[in-house]
């Protein structure tokens, strides 16, 4: 039972990663959308292998929420991990 639970969690994480990594960052007019903004210049190197995005809707008072949209084959909070499980690798 534990193995099937782990398999389900891994499958869920892989699907989530695929969905997030395939999301376009910029819209047709070069806008990130109403809840996403480009990160300020001081965060230009925040993501190791991806693009930094400021998620305004998730900000806490005095604590902005920055996240990364990872390049292909990279995962992790700051896109610092090479995804060797990707079948296209």
UniProtKB/Swiss-Prot annotation:
Annotated signal sequence range: 1-30
Superkingdom in the source lineage: Eukaryota
UniProt keywords, alphabetically: Disulfide bond, EGF-like domain, Neurotoxin, Secreted, Signal, Toxin
Disulfide bonds: 39-52, 47-68, 70-79
Keyword check for Membrane: no
Chief location category: secreted
Family: Belongs to the EGF domain peptide family.
Tissue and organ expression note: Expressed by the venom gland.
Single GO cellular component term: extracellular region
A molecular function (GO) term: toxin activity
Domain named EGF-like: residues: 43-80
Cellular compartment(s): Secreted
Function: Ant peptide with probable defensive activity which acts as a potent agonist of the mammalian epidermal growth factor receptor (EGFR). Mimics, both structurally and functionally, vertebrate epidermal growth factor (EGF) peptide hormones. In vivo, intraplantar injection in mice causes long-lasting (several days) hypersensitivity of the injected paw to both mechanical and thermal stimuli. Its long-lasting effect is unusual for venom toxins whose effects are usually immediate.
Record carries keyword Translocase: no
Protein name, per record: OMEGA-ectatommitoxin(02)-Rm1b
